[in-house]
């Protein structure tokens, strides 16, 4: 999975916590359009926005980044081999 999984993971946790997209955006201090674009995989959040989102959701960043970090780890080790 690539960077688009960040948005789908954010959406998954938002829905699990029964938070509306508008409420997440407000809590994170972001626009609803920006959060929607992130969730659809159209935009990759900045580090600051990602921190604001995970704090607003009450989750850790690794829960959102698990697919991306795992892929990067495999690529790094294959390049070093």
Regions flagged by a language model, labelled:
Residues 1-5, 73-76:
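A detector for short, charged/polar N-terminal pre-domain segments
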Residues 8-25, 79:
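Short basic helix-loop element that most often maps to the first helix and adjoining turn
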Residues 10, 21, 32, 47-50:
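Helix-turn-helix DNA-binding elements, focusing on the entry/boundary residues of the two helices
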